[in-house]
């Protein structure tokens, strides 16, 4: 009797197949590691794909300098425990200009520290393929993106100039100067991610679990007081509005641009139960997604992941 693969095992097999295909087809791939839950799952799948050997490519974190402190601690812990070959890149031009989300706004901060920083790192190391943990259920521009997302010599995405992927056959031929972004988790949902984390025992950043945290409401978004830098940009009136609430994060990014949600979910089973009932997008708390209609697609056309 042949055992049928479960839904999650089918997704796992598909993702591992994609990761192995890229490793075989491309000369110099890299796996982006943003420290979030999707990156954790993607890294776990990559380690499975090449077990018992080591990853045949490095992992890279494009650092904006504004991630949550717990994310940095978690990143360093994973690098040490797993023996990862980690590349960290910070846009030196952004550092020189002291680009930050308060003074320069979310759009400029994201463009310089994330998009331009990523493009710099890819060019510097000559990577021809970059894995990312984006999923189609996250956002409408990602919903129409291929697993192999082709980029031109300036890393720009043209949604009208992509290749068909019939029967899970991926064409990895690129012209000189071109590269691809690869999304092994394209067909996963947020619920799939959490169920897989639970079943596989994958470690994640504690910020995903509900706890009492200091927050301030800004334009309807609960922003966590993660370090003293945010206090420099708050008025005395704003500081008086800082309160403690039981919150967690469904998605993680730069902390001044990432909203928390009120929640009682303190465990993986609690989170899964919450996911079964929720009807809102996990990216509702991402300030950068509200920069304007079609803002994510515009960012991707310029080279954003």
From Swiss-Prot:
EC nos: 2.7.7.4
One example of a Gene Ontology biological process annotation: sulfate assimilation
Pathway: Sulfur metabolism; hydrogen sulfide biosynthesis; sulfite from sulfate: step 1/3
Catalytic reaction annotation: sulfate + ATP + H(+) = adenosine 5'-phosphosulfate + diphosphate
Disulfide bonds: none
Keywords assigned: ATP-binding, Nucleotide-binding, Nucleotidyltransferase, Transferase
A Pfam family hit: PAPS_reduct
GO molecular function: ATP binding; sulfate adenylyltransferase (ATP) activity
InterPro entries listed in its UniProt record: PAPS_reduct_dom, Rossmann-like_a/b/a_fold, SO4_adenylTrfase_ssu, Sulfate_adenylyltrnsfr_sub2
Reported function: With CysN forms the ATP sulfurylase (ATPS) that catalyzes the adenylation of sulfate producing adenosine 5'-phosphosulfate (APS) and diphosphate, the first enzymatic step in sulfur assimilation pathway. APS synthesis involves the formation of a high-energy phosphoric-sulfuric acid anhydride bond driven by GTP hydrolysis by CysN coupled to ATP hydrolysis by CysD.
Alphabetized HAMAP family for the sequence: Sulf_adenylyltr_sub2
NCBIfam families found in the cross-reference section: CysD, PRK05253.1, PRK12563.1
Family assignment from sequence similarity: Belongs to the PAPS reductase family. CysD subfamily.
Subunit details: Heterodimer composed of CysD, the smaller subunit, and CysN.
Protein name listed in UniProt: Sulfate adenylyltransferase subunit 2
Source organism of the structure: Pseudomonas fluorescens (strain Pf0-1)
Gene that this polypeptide is encoded by: cysD
